[in-house]
Amino acid sequence: XXXXXXXXXXXDGHCIPALGFGTYKPIEVPKSKAMEAANLAIGVGYRHIDTAYAYQIEEEIGQAIQSNIKAGIVKREDMFITTKLWCTCFQPELVRPSLEKXXXKLQLEHVDLFIMHYPVPMKAGDNDFPLDEQGKLLLDTVDFCATWEALEKXXDAGLVKSIGVSNFNMRQLERILNKPGLKYKPVCNQVECHVYNNQSKLLDYCKSKDIVLVAFGALGTQRYKEWVDQDSPVLLNDPVLCGGAKXXXRSPALIALRYLVQRGVVPLAQSFYESEMKENLQVFEFQLSPEDMKILDGLNKNFRYLPAQFFADHPEYPFSEE
């Protein structure tokens, strides 16, 4: 099944497959299940796999990739693998070691895309969420522009093909784009994006700068208890979305993904079920009419399932503005 042939061209000449597979797993899901999911995803045709240091799953994802390469299902060059730099590793001298560690866990010579997970530097050390005695986050004063220069060096060293950011607002993107001596601009900004938060302003801005907007939470997240308010609306139960799905004889998930793809967004779809994985790949097989798109635009309420409240006191907290 050679699916997901559609790709978005990035500013540096590389291509990003237009639908990705997300690998975040809630605490209650065992790592073996996440590895099995990644294995299935590659088997049914996903070539773009998105992971991160913070998901604590890179080794399992690496095993899934390797087993598919060994079985002759894919070649390394057909795969597009993203991982992310965690916020406690923003000191420039920590960037390359972090990238090398990630590549070793993933069993890869290089990753295709390495991105800053949040624009929020935190104190380096063994703790991923370093707190003081009062339970306040320990921040780091390093400027993420200095971190960016270290990402550029890793690209020059051949450890990564493309570099980008995640959860940056427009002002923060501007700071990198206007940085003196900028060598490579971010190829993407990965943010929460779905029909309830369609990011239209940020998307227009990113398009104007030739930055691909990658969407996590494209289906309204898996509503993991540790991060998502359980009273938040269930996106895939939205009556308008479900009505549109009925009319187009597709599932609500496919309509939600197609809405993003049609706007030039690269969605990450997450699932532990093979039937859903296969179905989500059908996003390239149909189109929504301009009327349908307008109706879906009307669902936007700038709602975040993942407001990253744990960073709310940080001076770089990205979500107080667009």
Swiss-Prot record:
PANTHER family: ALDO/KETO REDUCTASE (PTHR11732). It catalyses: morphine + NAD(+) = morphinone + NADH + H(+); morphine + NADP(+) = morphinone + NADPH + H(+). Strongly inhibited by sulfhydryl reagents and ketamine, but not by pyrazole, barbital and indomethacine. GO terms for biological process: alkaloid metabolic process. This is Aldo-keto reductase family 1 member C13. One of its GO terms (molecular function) is morphine 6-dehydrogenase activity. The active site is at Y55. Catalyzes the dehydrogenation of morphine to morphinone. The enzyme also exhibits significant activity for a variety of cyclic and alicyclic alcohols. In addition to xenobiotics, the enzyme catalyzes the dehydrogenation of 17-beta-hydroxysteroids with much higher affinities than morphine. Uses both NAD and NADP, but the activity is much greater with NAD than with NADP. Belongs to the aldo/keto reductase family. Its EC number is 1.1.1.-, 1.1.1.218. NAD(+) binds at residues 20-24, 50, 166-167, 190, 216-224, 270-280. It is an enzyme of class 1 (oxidoreductase). InterPro entries: AKR, AKR1C, Aldo/ket_reductase_CS, NADP_OxRdtase_dom, NADP_OxRdtase_dom_sf. The gene is AKR1C13. Transmembrane segments: none annotated. Substrate binds at H117. Monomer. Optimum pH is 9.3 with NAD as the cofactor. The keyword NAD applies. The record marks K84 as: Lowers pKa of active site Tyr.
